[in-house]
Amino acid sequence: MHKPACALLLALSLAGCSMAPTYERPEAPVASSWNSPAAKTGQAASNLDWQTFIVDSELRNLVGVALDNNRSLRQTLLDIEQARAQYRIQRADRVPGLSAAANGNRQRLPGDLSNTGSSAVSSSYQVGLALPEYELDLFGRVKSLTDAALEQYLSTEAAARSAQIALIAEVSQAYLTYDGAQRRLQLTEQTLASREDSLGLISQRRSAGAATALDYQEALGLVEQSRAELESNARQKQQALNALVLLLGTADAAKRIPQLPQDKPMLIQDIAPGTPSELIERRPDILAAEHVLKARNADIGAARAAFFPRISLTGSFGTSSAEMSGLFDGGSRSWSFVPTLSLPIFDAGRNSANLDLAKVRKDSAVAAYEGTIQTAFREVADALAATDTLRREEAARRALANTTNETLKLAKARYEGGVDSHLRYLDAQRSNFVNESAYIETSTQRQIALVDLFRALGGGWSGEVTAQR
């Protein structure tokens, strides 16, 4: 085999050897387990996707609509397409290109520049294949840049998964807030009707001399209080509806949303968080931060390779002739092969500065990665604390609401039987309304906290991340 061919094969075999440091994942700066009793309850988050987590079919449908139509999410998903295209562009540099080329040239040479002393007109025509400049990646510069582009693409993809999970959580929480506002509004309407009935009864008793003006004013005050609370709850319901409509992103979003509160006590289910090590492997923002760290690690390889020679090849093969008609005549074959070697000798410290910059950027990415883990750990711990305490609070408030409801029934019977005063009955009405409202609020907050936990754990997203066109 010819020596030039052997040298070329050796160069190609060495191409792509990376000078990037061996990547090692930093140790997670968090504890190895969760310090919460709630960590042992519910289905494991690693086995739970959002369709299973959401029990209510209406809410599942709304989340699906939002995933298909939300504008902010669509923009995020299109960022994936940009990152994927950028990676493909960078990856193409690792493969020699080939293009067809044809050119013609016709020029006049003045007599004072001609060997014959007379002006002359010359022509040349060429057609063939051309090899654009191709770098032999002996020291892994192009490979490192390609690896960095790949990690940036994977980071963008993970960030998009995080955006999808965030949207699922936002829609779920907006829906839970809306459902809670509906339930409070329904309770207020029932309470107002009951208090208006009581006011009518007292008005009759007052006309008969069996009730005082004070009794009437007390009852009237409760009616006006209920009317004010009715407007407040109606406003909260409408605001929650507006937030949900915005998240859904469709013109007919309001028509898709149920107009009556759900009769199920729980619209979502309990989940168990698993271990912090599982969180690192599952949560998208942690994965995105690690991909950025890997990209910065690859950048060091590219910066190191800049200190070494760079060899590039260009060439062409085809036919040439002074006449266009002679391009394909025998003997018109032509070729060129132009290897180029570039070796940095003096660059005023540019390459050293680039290497220092790459190392500092990697250190910064390590700090960002560790900070992301700590933030995720804190969010999970906060969500576990909230779900644990709210679960017990919800049970206590349900028991309290049941008790005050029975008290109201007894107080009403005793008042109508003339055994107790009207004031005792009004106090029972007021106490029952306050405790029923508190139970609804706590129940809503508990489910919202479960959604926070679901998001903090990475959401159990199992679908492919693709842009909706």
Regions found by a protein language model. Name each.
Residues 142, 158-275, 386, 410, ...:
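Periplasmic alpha-helical coiled-coil/stalk elements that build and connect Gram-negative outer-membrane
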Residues 74-92, 101-105, 294:
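Short, acidic/charged, Gly/Pro-enriched secondary-structure junctions
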Residues 63, 126-128, 175, 220, ...:
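Membrane-embedded beta-strand positions in outer-membrane beta-barrel channels/transporters
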Residues 192, 196-200, 225-253, 303, ...:
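Short segments within alpha-helical structural elements
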Residues 38-41, 45-54, 103-131, 254-272, ...:
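Small/polar, glycine/serine/threonine/aspartate-rich low-complexity segments that form flexible
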